[in-house]
A protein has these predicted regions:
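Generic structural detector for well-ordered beta-strands
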Residues: 15-21, 55, 65, 79, ...
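Hydrophobic ligand-binding cavity/cleft-lining segments
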Residues: 1-46
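Hydrophobic pocket/interface hotspot
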Residues: 27-28, 37, 62-64, 80, ...
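Glycine-rich portal/gate segments that line the openings of hydrophobic small-molecule binding cavities
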Residues: 48-92
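A generic structural micro-feature
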Residues: 8-10, 54-56, 70-74, 99-102, ...
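Intrinsic-disorder/low-complexity, polar/charged segments enriched in Ser/Thr/Lys/Arg/Asp/Glu/Gln
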Residues: 11-17, 49, 61, 75, ...
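A short, structured loop/turn motif at beta-sheet edges
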Residues: 24-25, 55-57, 81-88, 109-118
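Beta-strand/loop substructures that line and gate deep hydrophobic ligand-binding cavities in soluble
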Residues: 13, 90-141
Length: 154
């Protein structure tokens, strides 16, 4: 429905927003149901997620592993801190490239927006250097490719 927008705030925050032509319930479920996550959260074309563990409950763990089929890959692990069904998810994650990145604290909101959903994801990183390094990876392109795929299954 709309492309991902990205803005920074202060030294440690990144705020992503995107609108979806689907209900908050559907978009939330796509972020918490491992069978759905494994279908859309793939990044650029050619990547797959052979491992998708997602225990969407407070204290629950998740682990996503991606591969590009050419020997490259990475994984993310994390823990859910808070879940408000269909409206809000708070979690902490770290990426392994192969060494772990510092923890990234993420709050994602799913707000009704007319006939669709406005998703707002606020990341809080430990310092400006970590934020700059994260943004320099081009993650925005991979996120948007995933969200385009998500729209196709909502």
């Amino acid at each position: 429905m709309s492309k991902l927008t990205v803005k920074t705030e202060g030294d440690t925050h990144v705020i992503f927003t995107r609108r979806f032509a689907a209900s908050p319930e559907s978009v939330y479920r796509a972020h918490t149901d491992p069978e759905l996550v494994q279908k859309w959260l793939l990044g650029p074309e050619g990547w797959t997620m052979p491992v998708c563990i997602n225990e969407a409950k407070p204290g629950g763990k998740f682990r996503y592993e991606w591969t590009n089929g050419k020997g490259g890959g990475f994984h993310i692990t994390g823990e859910y801190l808070e879940l408000e069904p269909y409206s809000r998810i708070v979690h902490v994650e770290r990426m392994f490239l192969p060494d772990p990145t510092p923890d990234n604290h993420i709050e994602t909101r799913f707000d009704a927006d007319g006939p669709g959903t406005l998703m707002t994801m606020r990341m809080t990183l430990p310092d400006s250097q970590t934020r700059a390094a994260m943004l320099a990876t081009g993650m925005e392109r991979g996120m948007e490719a995933s969200y385009v795929r998500l729209e196709g299954i909502l």
